[in-house]
From Swiss-Prot:
Signal peptide: none annotated. Its EC number is 2.7.7.6. GO terms for cellular component: cytoplasm; DNA-directed RNA polymerase complex. Keywords: DNA-directed RNA polymerase, Nucleotidyltransferase, Transcription, Transferase. Belongs to the RNA polymerase alpha chain family. GO terms for biological process: DNA-templated transcription. Homodimer. The RNAP catalytic core consists of 2 alpha, 1 beta, 1 beta' and 1 omega subunit. When a sigma factor is associated with the core the holoenzyme is formed, which can initiate transcription. The N-terminal domain is essential for RNAP assembly and basal transcription, whereas the C-terminal domain is involved in interaction with transcriptional regulators and with upstream promoter elements. Residues 246-325 are annotated as: Alpha C-terminal domain (alpha-CTD). Residues 1-231 are annotated as: Alpha N-terminal domain (alpha-NTD). One of its GO terms (molecular function) is DNA-directed RNA polymerase activity. This is DNA-directed RNA polymerase subunit alpha. It catalyses: RNA(n) + a ribonucleoside 5'-triphosphate = RNA(n+1) + diphosphate.
Length: 325
């Protein structure tokens, strides 16, 4: 009787468009498609290294609720548009770039003055619209990071972070935009009870879908290698206690789930502001929320499931220190 496990012999990559691909891997033993597919998906969404604007200083602006003469967008929308610019740094971890433009017209990411080791992936991305006499002068700090880091939980080591007019942004570093997977049936000779893993990956263009799945696989191998070696420098008794790491996805506001206005308002009325708050609630608790019915509950469950989450989960040390409500 064969006791060794099958390893995938076929890995095919099919391009579905720019920065979008389908990766097919087969065969797997039954059950391994879901085991590996879910693990890869979680790593792809939460652990990929990327680049994002983290701080912005706009001439003539003290805080994000200001407006600028001659600029169609208010500062809040201007910041949202700046967060949509996809940067890529080469051989450095941070850089400050400048955006200066005046006169009537459209301001795009291609108007940003870049250093030689900084690149904009989407130069046609619209940032603002200037009317006659309008002027925009912006300093943008771009940093390398991982996952999603809300501005209100970031830590700084010097007083310069408190400069009036400097606006700290929520930073979504992940270069992976969307990931989904399905498990289909596969066959090898007479065996028909095998799995075929099909992953659908879309990135921002900083890395290709193929490179994204390679990096996620390396991360998993690196993490699991500790268990394979069963060697450590600390015993359980000697190891200092460490606070559990919180998945960056849980620090995102519930607005990022893109729920209907009705569902989102019901959650906020119950002081559910972050995804980490939401997943700790049970179905029965949510159904007791005024104006939140079964239809809204099903919508919430479907959106959470698309991110590998469910209701009724337990979190340690929640909320983390510094998380605003």
């Amino acid at each position: 009787m064969q006791t060794s496990l099958l390893k995938p012999k076929i890995i095919a990559v099919e391009s579905l468009g720019e920065n979008h691909a389908k990766v097919v891997m087969e065969p797997f033993e039954r059950g391994y498609g879901h085991t590996l597919g879910n693990a890869l998906r979680r790593v792809l969404l939460s652990s990929m290294v990327g680049y994002a604007p983290t701080e912005v200083t706009i001439a003539g602006v003290v805080h994000e609720y200001s407006t600028l003469d001659g600029v169609q967008e208010d500062v809040v929308n201007l910041l949202l548009n700046l967060k949509g610019v996809v940067f890529k740094l080469h051989n450095r971890d941070e850089v400050t770039v400048t955006l200066r433009k005046e006169g009537e017209g459209v301001v795009t990411a291609g108007d940003i003055e870049l250093a030689h080791d900084c690149e904009v992936i989407n130069p046609n991305h619209v940032i603002a619209h200037l009317s006659k006499g309008g002027k925009l002068d912006v300093q943008i700090k771009v940093e390398k990071g991982r996952g999603y880091v809300p501005g209100n939980v970031r830590r700084y080591g010097d007083e310069t972070a408190k400069i009036i007019g400097r606006i700290v942004l929520d930073a979504s570093f992940s270069p992976v935009r969307r990931v989904s997977y399905t498990v289909e049936s596969a066959r090898v000779e007479q065996r028909t009870d095998l799995d075929k893993l099909v992953m659908n990956i879309e990135t921002s263009g900083v890395i290709t879908p193929e490179e994204a799945i390679r990096q996620s696989a390396r991360i998993l191998v690196d993490q699991l290698s500790v268990f394979a070696a069963l060697e450590g420098t600390e015993t359980a008794a000697e190891a200092p206690s460490r606070a559990p790491q919180i998945d960056p996805i849980l620090l995102r506001p519930v607005d990022d789930l893109e729920l209907t206005v009705r569902s989102a308002n019901c959650l906020k009325a119950e002081n559910i502001y972050y995804i980490g708050d939401l997943i700790q609630r049970t179905e029965n608790e949510l159904l007791k929320t005024p104006n939140l019915g079964r239809k809204s509950l099903n919508e919430i469950k479907e959106v959470l499931a698309s991110r590998g989450l469910t209701l009724g989960m337990k979190l340690e040390n929640w909320p983390p220190a510094g998380l605003d409500k």
